Curated annotation (Swiss-Prot):
This is Peroxisomal membrane protein 11C. Belongs to the peroxin-11 family. It comes from the Eukaryota. Keywords: Membrane, Peroxisome, Transmembrane, Transmembrane helix. Homodimer. Heterodimer with either PEX11A or PEX11B. Interacts with FIS1.
Length: 241
């Protein structure tokens, strides 16, 4: 019963619910794509799963109509990142925040065009939206890789201190941060593969992924981000008095 209560409580969170919908959507696309391509006698089930996947994706698009304000508050609080020690991370984060802020209205316009609310070319807005997502993922991957390398450098030869002389708690915190950055990097790269696939044909491997491969990349990314969230939650519980 306690587990059921915790699950119910977690699902009240928008982030947890979005993460679950995302994972289910990509899992349905993965399984559905495999059934359609590899199992002719189960192709009808596969097509139904692909429809379910599309509906999950549409659900997330509608829910993101309300994310602009939260993103704006975060961007405003970060500002120009004057508190950031690493100037490279600082400007990567500023550019990433601007990209993410522009992503939402572009998606809203594309959605409204598909819904016949606005008379504009939805394909153009979806392309711009995907390009912004691709840039955001690329910036996130570079940021995670840079942070990971800097932390590893500190562990190996921190200024004026040998690695063995670092306090155990600080060393564990740095190792946990490195693990978190690795998960972020891999998750962003998996999403980046899909983002490029959804760009106009002629751009790298755009349009070449079968549905099951899109589902696989998305499922990997979703599982990695879920693992990262669970680790962060446990770390927060451990740090709380």
């Amino acid at each position: 019963m306690a587990l059921l209560n915790r699950l119910a409580s977690a699902l009240e969170s928008h982030r947890v619910r979005d993460r679950l919908i995302r994972t289910l959507g990509y899992c349905c696309q993965l399984i559905g794509g495999v059934l359609v391509e590899q199992c002719p006698n189960r192709s009808e089930v596969g097509r139904r799963l692909l429809v379910v996947s599309a509906q999950f994706n549409h659900c997330r698009t509608v829910l993101r109509l309300f994310d602009d304000l939260a993103m704006f508050v975060y961007t405003k609080q970060y500002g120009l990142g004057t508190k950031e020690e690493d100037i490279f991370i600082r400007w990567l984060s500023v550019l990433s925040n601007v990209t993410d802020q522009l992503y939402y209205p572009c998606e809203h316009i594309a959605w409204a065009a598909d819904a016949k609310v606005l008379r504009v070319d939805s394909a153009w807005w979806w392309t711009l939206n995907t390009a912004l997502w691709t840039l955001s993922l690329l910036l996130g991957a570079v940021k995670a890789l840079w942070t990971m390398l800097k932390l590893r450098q500190k562990l190996r030869s921190p200024t004026g201190t040998s690695a063995s002389q670092l306090p155990r708690s600080k060393r564990r915190a740095m190792e946990a941060r490195i693990c978190s950055e690795v998960l972020t990097l891999l998750s962003n790269l998996a999403d980046l593969a899909n983002a490029v696939h959804w760009l106009p044909r002629g751009v790298l491997w755009a349009g070449r992924f079968p549905p099951w491969l899109v589902g696989l990349m998305g499922t990997i990314s979703s599982i990695l981000s879920t693992c990262q969230a669970v680790r962060a939650g446990r770390q927060a519980e451990a740090d709380s008095p």
